[in-house]
Amino acid sequence: MRSGFVSIIGRTNAGKSSLLNALLNEKIAIVSHKQNATRRKINGIVMNEGDQIIFVDTPGLHESEKILNKLMINEAVKSMGDCDAMIFIASVHDDTSDYEKFLNLNPKKPHILVLSKVDEVSNEKLLKKMMQYQNFQSRFTALVPFSIKKQSYQKPLLDEICKLLPEHAYFYDPQFLTDTNEKEIFRDFILEAIYENLSDEIPYLSDVSVDKVVEKAGITEIFATIITEKDTHKSMIIGKNGETIKRIGIFARKLIKNLTNCKIYLKLDVVVKRGWSKDEKIIKKLIGY
């Protein structure tokens, strides 16, 4: 019996959260085509035959001087030391530079290199890309192609991961999907809805606080606050006649309902907290770093 923690590392938009959701066969992690949508670690628990893998989805590695982004990067780097093993995700469309930057961080734990989005390229291009990464074969334990669209890729990856786990009793009940508080998952789903319905800087200068969750017979009531930096942002989040916040609510409710399988009532308020994304204390309290 093996059990351990595996951090999912990669640049922004490499497909880390999509991979976690695919392995869980359930959506619990925020997914967006916009960069840096993942701000918090989230754990997903996967059983592979008799072994238990606790995946830790992390913010994407990137370069920024902004306080919020620096804290996100620190969270990802810290997870590299707190785990038993890692998987580094590299898109098949990218060159090897992001992986080289990861190696320059001098990771101490063993890692598997996962090539994502392989369904989007020809076999010839995939083989060419794998040959490029073979130059680093002394650094990784395995090079595994992966596609979230094809389940046949999952078992080989899980088997390789389990080889790196220590002999250990299960950390969690095998029936558990995640140990992440449901409030945090709901919060991320609402944030995903903001990313999908608003553009420019607004999603990056906004966050969400889930203030209260009330479970009743047949319905879960969620009361949440969207926090943003400027009055103009608040107006745009609400939209003309409340149309934008209505779309955000519909999008978020659908995500939450798909996870909980129950009727959802979602009440969203919007408040302005000027400079929150530049205040380390506020960020740590809000996001949980």
From Swiss-Prot:
This is GTPase Era. CDD domains: Era, KH-II_Era. Residues 57-60 are annotated as: G3. Its main location: cytoplasm. The lineage of its organism: Bacteria, Pseudomonadati, Campylobacterota, Epsilonproteobacteria, Campylobacterales. Residues 146-148 are annotated as: G5. It comes from Campylobacter curvus (strain 525.92). Keywords: Cell inner membrane, Cell membrane, Cytoplasm, GTP-binding, Membrane, Nucleotide-binding, Ribosome biogenesis, RNA-binding, rRNA-binding. GTP binds at residues 10-17, 57-61, 116-119. It is found in: Cytoplasm; Cell inner membrane. Signal peptide: none annotated. Residues 10-17 are annotated as: G1. PANTHER family: GTPASE ERA, GTPASE ERA, MITOCHONDRIAL. Residues 36-40 are annotated as: G2.
